[in-house]
């Protein structure tokens, strides 16, 4: 079900221990610490393998996440805003990652630009609660979605390359 490259990526992301969501005050602080450690490790791994593709930050409470992700196609870098909220039932419920500027541009997306992850990602996530976290959602959810959808959207002319400083169309 998971290819060798994905398996290698996954095995290099630390698994999380604490089963806590935003409602579990003290435990949530511990979970956030684990989330950041896993994200830092994942970004370091990506940089060392020359496959750096996103930046994320969160609000103070760690319940709203936002940043940028990018996809390189034919040597052009396509950059998108990425955002998601941590569900109150997290980690039992995976975050719904959104790329707002692509809202309505592909069938594999829900209202608000939330990417469709139901078929492949959600069952894998539910089997791995609480071990999977935000880094895993990026690696198993957003990364493959970008790899499939962005080249298709570029081919169809739905997504166009923007020079630095240009605004979205």
From Swiss-Prot:
GO terms for cellular component: cytoplasm. Gene3D superfamilies: Ubiquitin Conjugating Enzyme. It holds the Pfam family UFC1. Belongs to the ubiquitin-conjugating enzyme family. UFC1 subfamily. Keywords: Ubl conjugation pathway. E2-like enzyme which forms an intermediate with UFM1 via a thioester linkage. Transmembrane segments: none annotated. InterPro entries: UBQ-conjugating_enzyme/RWD, Ufc1. GO terms for biological process: protein K69-linked ufmylation. One of its GO terms (molecular function) is UFM1 conjugating enzyme activity. This is Ubiquitin-fold modifier-conjugating enzyme 1. The active site is at 116 (glycyl thioester intermediate). The keyword Lipoprotein does not apply.
């Amino acid at each position: 079900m998971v290819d060798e490259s994905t398996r290698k990526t996954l095995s290099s992301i630390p698994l999380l221990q604490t089963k806590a969501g935003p409602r579990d005050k003290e435990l949530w602080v511990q979970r956030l610490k684990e989330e950041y450690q896993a994200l830092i490790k994942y970004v370091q791994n990506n940089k060392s393998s020359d496959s750096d593709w996103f930046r994320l930050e969160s609000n103070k409470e760690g319940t709203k996440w936002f940043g940028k992700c990018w996809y390189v196609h034919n040597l052009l870098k396509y950059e998108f805003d990425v955002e998601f909220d941590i569900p109150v039932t997290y980690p039992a419920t995976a975050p719904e990652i959104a790329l707002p500027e692509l809202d309505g541009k592909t069938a594999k997306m829900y209202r608000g630009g939330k990417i469709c992850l139901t078929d492949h990602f959600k069952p894998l996530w539910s089997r791995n609660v609480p071990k999977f976290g935000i880094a895993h959602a990026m690696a198993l959810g957003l990364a493959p979605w970008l790899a499939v959808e962005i080249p298709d959207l570029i081919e169809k002319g739905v997504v166009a390359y923007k020079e630095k400083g240009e605004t979205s169309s």
